[in-house]
Structures are given as structure tokens and as C-alpha cells.
């Protein structure tokens, strides 16, 4: 289950917990007790039916550095007999998302429009995917009327055609139509599709080329509704309709809770709701939060944002409705079990955009203090901060990190008083701005806002680097020192309060504070032959600085191919393990690290319920113990339609499947989304090889697994006889690798 919805008071205490975790163990225990007491009191109050504090109340200060909120800053203006128009911009023109978004619209129909709350939608469907409701694949507009059927729309289309939902002009036209036909006192705009964080999202099969803007990232991802285009579209929509601003803008999409995204929409909305992580296929609980709005149309956007967060997953129709839940899971499971599994890594937060400028101001001060600190320690905080799924592939470390968790780690790692004070001020400002947030136990360091902090390779690459970042996240870059900090961090140039464009471009040259010069001694073996009864012991020593993670590698020699097949990889546990707010990372003692590992000839296989196939499980997330780690295997997901998509299956350390992610790119890049497997869907494993003659890496399609009624699991198997290559891989804090290998025969 996700963490309970947090009131402003609980969020304030939680941010204080982060700082305590950085500074003092006794204070940490004291604040943990206070947090538990506060949450218990809130739950008891809610159970007794006592109303929540009004949105205009001032929360208890989380730290003495907090600036008191001005009177009336807690909510927007409301009026008697207030009316709403809620606009759903639903781009379902995608194999993965079509059914989920279509059902979201049907969830809204279960509530339907009233005289004070009008619900409208523009939905674009996919050709050849979900076949429900007549399998139409056009773009339609609806005035949403009440209807209980989750699989067929009862509302009549108000317009039909085909539109490029990745075009900002399409969004402007929809908003214009909604305002002209359904004027109201307050407007909410909710956008659904693939999200990508600061680049934006919202792709469409009808889109061609690179779009309206010549930005480097478009050369890789094509025509999307990039963030600067969304900024322009919202400005045009607000200007042409004269609505002043939206009361709330929501992103029912993955990865959009970036401070860069909130900065882009801040001029056009009072409140925003978004997720830091990949959203589950369920999306938002439309029937639940719209029902709250219909029952209380006098609420403001803060209350609506809290309702969206509060109902997320736990009140979704496909969780609480028995028939819909069975259809969604393919099994007879309880609502509690489905909610718990679905919410494990889910996140959602509601933000008061009026308080965002204070966050940006505090972020500037924090960036300045980071610029004066030891950059290698800052890099360590970046690498170990709570991270989220990457759109740039697995070749680079995660670059989307939780801003609050990173600030706490930076204070801890640097031990710098100025950094700590700036982190306190930043967390206090964020505590004021974040109205509500929820996150599952697998994302314990998620606090509601992410930020982009790439490694040196991503920063210097054209598609992910300075040119794309400052062009796409333009409003944020124009009003923040963060991009200037990144330039200083990766070039060694001084950082000042003046926002300037670097000359020459930072891609041309620079430094990598997280990089380390790491060497590995030749591996010594206890024996050259390994059996199930006689394991081998591998020993070596790693020497160097900025060591992040160490991995075990196992490869199998295929004589017919004259190639080495990647068979297994795993984390080597650190000399110690530390945690900040439940996010664990290894600690290595000194620049000289002895490594010893006993290898019993073991590989791993995936069981789909009908067959078992040996598979490479890649280490994904470090945990307190091996059972708490997560692993992944990549392949091609094959839908019933025959369409293939690059995908990643995530397992926990206990052997259970946790999620399946699909990517819009062909190699694990692009927008991720959670796939809800249907019986008969297939997954083709991708095998990774190293050609011994050409010294080149390549992949081939391997065995096929099928989704059915039995949940997938992984389990250990005996390694078959043959020649193996064993080794250790040491990763520095910038994502570079040092390696040492040795051959072993398995009998």
C-alpha cells in the first residue's frame, strides 16, 4: 500500500526527518516517533469523522528556517454556487495505453456531468489495439454523461475526426472548444498519455518528423508535445479564452512531477498534480475524485488535488469493483491485495504552484552552496539519491532523482554547514508547496518533486545535454540557477548568482566529478574447476576513488558462436550498508577494497507457469539485503495484435514479478509505461553476447515466455557444464566501469 496521504503537518515532519537522517541518529529516532504519532492522530481524527484543517490554515513549521506563509496563501478564491469544467485531454493512440485510458473515460462516466460540474473529453484511440466499444480509432470529443458501463461509452460524441494529440495547437483548440461551450468559474485540465519528465511527452502515430522546434532531443524521440511547446500552448489557450488561469493542471502520465515541469505550467495554473515514477496502468481513480468534486463543487483546486492523491489506486474502479478487478488482474484477488501490489512503486503529489517561486529561490541558494562543496561528494549524493525510471536507457545511471532526498544526502555526504543550511531552507520551501503526496514502499525516498541531474555523459550528449535541456525546459532554465550549476559541476567553471549562457558550449570540454581512476588486481581462484559440491572462491582488490557499486559477472562460452553469452550479474554487498529514509546504498572502506566471493555454479531461470527458461537477471536496485534488491530482464513484448515493443520485466529479490515496463524507443529508451499483461501475450528474451573475434557486443532474440494465469517467478538452477568467464565489475559514481575476469570450468 502507498504511504498514507500526508497532511501539510505530516509532510513538514517528513522533511524534517530527512534532515535528521543526515545529521543526527538520536534526532532521527525522535522525529520518527513524532511522525508515527502524528500520522496515527490524523488517522484517528479521520476515523472519528473530524474534518481536516481548512486549506488556509498555517502548518506547523518543519524547521526554524521556514518563512511563515502569507495570510490566504493556502487556497484560491471560491464563490457561492461555484461551477467547474473539467477537461480530459486523453491521448490513447498507443497500444499500451489505449484500453487503460479508454476505461478512465468510462470511470468519469460513472459520475457524469451535473449542473455545476461539467466533464468533457477529447480522446484519440489506437488502430489495431483494444477492440472494445466498436473498435473505433478516431479522435472524438465528448460531453460526459452518467453511465455505469466501464467498457462502452454511453455519452454521444460531440465531434469526431483525426487529430495529432502531440501538437500544441490541438490542445489549444480543445481548451477553446471546452471554454466556449461549457463556461465555468473554475477550470481543470488533465492530460493523459506517455510522460517523459522535463522533455514532455504525448506522442502520436500521425506525428511526423521532429515537430515545430529544432531541438536536439527531437532527433532521437521525434515529434512530441515537448515542454516548451506545452508552455506556449497553455499561454495561448489562457490568452484566447480569457480564463485567467486553470485552477488545476494534472498529468495522468509517467515521470511528470519534475520541478522543471511545475515551473513550465506555474504561470497558467494555481495547482498541479503529477507522478515522479512510472504510473500503473490503472491511471487515476477518476470516478472517486470526480465524485468528491460533484458532491462538493464549492471546493478549490487544493482540495481537488488532495482528492486525486488520496483516491489514487486504492479507490480506482478496477480495484474496488469486483468484476473490473478480476478483468484487470485475470485472477480472483482481493481489492486490498491488488491495491498493495499496484501501489508498491507508485507515486503522486499535489503542488501549490503559487509557492513554487519560493522553491526555486531556495533551489538557487542550494545550487550556489553545492557549487562551493567538494564536487565528488555531490556526485555521490546524486548517485545514491532516490531515483526513478530513465528515458535514456540503461547505459547511464538514473538521472531523474528526488529533489528532497538528494538535498538530504548532499548535506550528509558533504558535511558542509552551508550546504546543510541551504538544504533545510529548500526542504522547508518544498514542505510549503507540496499539498499532498503518496508513494509506495519501494520508493521510500520519494517526496513529490524530481529534478534532472545527469551524469557527465548524458550532460554532454546532444539529446540529453545542455542544449536540449535549456531549450525544452526553457522557463525553468531562464528562472533558475540549476542549469548553471550543472555547467559548473561538469566544467569546473565558477558558479555565480548571475544566470549566463556558457561559452563555449559545455559539451565541448569538461570534468566528471563522479569519475574514479579504479584498478582491479588480477583475480585469484581457489580452483580452476567448480562443481555443485565444490564452489570456487574469487579474490581480488579494487583500488581507487569514487567507487559506487561492485557487481559479479558470469558469462558462458558458446563455442559454436565463438562468443560469450551474458548469463548472470548481481550486486556485491558493500563493506557496510547505509540508508537515508529507506533508500539503501553501499559503503566501501577506503580506497583499497578487498573483494572475495564464493561462487557455486548457479544461474537463474524464469517460470511462466508452463515452462522454465534460463535468463539474465540484471541488478536494478540495491537493497538492505539480497532479498530487498530488485532485478530486471529485457526483451520484446508481443501483444495479441502481433505488435512488438521493447520491454523490461522487474522482479524483486524474493523471486516475484513486480512490473512490466514498455518503452516507446527500440532499445529501452523513450517514454516508459507499465504494461498490464493479458493472457496469451508473449515476452521474447533478449540475449546479450560478446563476440570474441570482433570484440563487439550484440543482442539476439532468445527464448519466449507467455503470460497466463500463473504469476511469473524466478528461481536458481544449476549452471550447465562448460567453460565460464567470471569477473568483477566496479562502477564509479559517474557510470564508468573497471573490470577483471577469469575463466572457470564447470563440471
Spans of features found by a protein language model:
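Terminal, contiguous helix-loop blocks that mediate binding/assembly
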Residues: 72, 76-79, 204-207, 211-747
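Short, solvent-exposed loop/turn and secondary-structure capping segments
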Residues: 99-101, 131-134, 199-204, 261-262, ...
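N-terminal extension/subdomain marker
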Residues: 66-184
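Extracytoplasmic/secreted envelope proteins and their assembly/folding machinery
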Residues: 32, 39, 102-105, 109, ...
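Ser/Thr-rich, Proline-interspersed low-complexity disordered segments
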Residues: 13, 17, 22-77, 503
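Structural recognition of the beta-strand scaffold that forms the well-ordered cores
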Residues: 85-89, 118-123, 187-191, 247-251, ...
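Bacterial N-terminal signal peptides that target proteins for export
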Residues: 1-9
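Gly/Ser/Thr-rich loops at beta-strand to alpha-helix junctions
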Residues: 93-96, 193-199, 250, 254-258
